Amino acid sequence: MTTYEDFQRATLFFDAKDYAGAARLLAPIAAENPGNRAVRELLARAYFHSAQLGRAEDAFRRLVDLDPCNGWAYEALARTLERRSRHGEARTYRNMAQAMGVDPADKVDVSLTAANLA
């Protein structure tokens, strides 16, 4: 399989709400292509939705580093920090996102079962 086909497969897993499965497929792609923002974003989102918050934080921070003008990445990082009960730190990133014209995100429904973590 090509990298593109692997990415497409991971996207199918993500769309099917198998976020942990998508993350497993995306992690090696991100390691091989560290500057690819699309891969990094989908990986961070997969980590976030599968409640792998430490990994999501790292991935969103990397995304912010890769694209410092991406207000959505700042908002996503703020959401991740809030889920980790780091509200003061999240406020800084939320303010950056709002300064870039990004409205605060709506609450995200996160469903996680033991099967997702297998």
Label each region the model flagged:
Residues 42, 76, 110-111:
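Canonical tetratricopeptide repeat
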Residues 28-31, 61-65, 98-99:
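Conserved structural position within tetratricopeptide repeats
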Residues 2-32:
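Alpha-helical segment of the N-proximal tetratricopeptide repeat
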Residues 15-16, 49, 83-84, 100:
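Register position in tetratricopeptide repeats
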